[in-house]
């Protein structure tokens, strides 16, 4: 069983291994970098990998991948022209704007991705995972950010669209992991994002592997519990 990831102090979340001289392209960059640092030695290898950024937007995740040695990044987003200009001009970045990742044709990206990261809004990861698998190599890895506010039913959302109940976090993360299992992926680790979303939503990274073993159910649940307890939601509960 993987050992639960340890949470870092959110105040130190901007202190990452690549020590950027300038800010990341978006706040999302600090979320991914923070999660990678939390995972530590258990984090996926980025250097030399062909990567795919699902929901690239302004390029926070793409930025982190490049700074940590990605060979190339396929930046996919349903919008247009959002990616930071410097990233658009980087020869290592392949821009696929106006592309709904759920319906991505693998032929559109050429060589499949070895590592896929994702920061998607207004859609459940459960609907997207099949497309991500089709766009990846047989031994690919995935580090996907679960946003409970887009996984839970609208009737369960709190004021301002914030999911505050850790029990809801637990069940939404487990549901994404179950969808991953149905698509041939195994769970490697779970970590809370050290930075909440703009409205205060706590988000979680699930680290998955294609063809990797899925831990027994209780071990999976324990990984999720530990991620919640060590993350902002657990800290908030402790402070009350």
Language-model features: locations:
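Conserved S-adenosyl-L-methionine
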Residues: 49, 64-72
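Short, glycine-/aromatic-enriched active-site segment of Class I SAM-dependent methyltransferases
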Residues: 148-165
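A short glycine-rich, Lys/Arg-flanked "PGG" loop and its adjoining helix->strand segment in the class I
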Residues: 126-143
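S-adenosyl-L-methionine
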Residues: 72-127
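Flexible, glycine-/basic-rich loop-and-beta segments that form/coincide
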Residues: 202, 208-240
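Glycine-rich SAM-binding Motif I of class I
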Residues: 59-60, 81
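Conserved class I S-adenosyl-L-methionine
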Residues: 45-57
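S4-like RNA-binding module at protein N-termini
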Residues: 1-42
């Amino acid at each position: 069983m993987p050992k639960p990831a340890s949470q870092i102090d959110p105040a130190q979340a901007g202190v990452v291994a690549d020590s950027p001289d300038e800010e990341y392209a978006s706040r999302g960059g600090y979320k991914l970098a923070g999660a990678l640092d939390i995972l530590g030695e258990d984090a996926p290898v980025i250097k030399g990998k062909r990567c795919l950024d699902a929901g690239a937007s302004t390029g926070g995740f793409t930025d982190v991948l490049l700074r940590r040695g990605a060979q190339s990044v396929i930046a996919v987003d349903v919008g247009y022209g959002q990616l930071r200009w410097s990233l658009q001009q980087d020869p290592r970045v392949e821009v696929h704007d106006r592309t709904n990742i759920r319906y991505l044709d693998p032929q559109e990206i050429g060589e499949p991705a070895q590592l896929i990261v994702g920061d998607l809004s207004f859609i459940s990861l459960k609907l997207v995972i099949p497309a991500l698998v089709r766009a990846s190599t047989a031994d690919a890895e995935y580090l996907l950010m679960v946003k409970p506010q887009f996984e839970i039913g609208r009737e369960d959302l709190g004021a301002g669209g914030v999911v505050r109940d850790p029990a809801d976090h637990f069940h939404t993360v487990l549901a994404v992991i179950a969808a991953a299992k149905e698509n041939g992926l195994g769970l490697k680790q779970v970590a809370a994002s050290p930075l909440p979303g703009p409205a205060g939503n706590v988000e979680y990274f699930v680290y998955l592997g294609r063809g990797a073993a899925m831990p027994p159910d209780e071990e999976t649940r324990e990984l999720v519990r530990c991620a919640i307890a060590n993350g902002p939601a657990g800290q908030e509960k402790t402070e009350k």
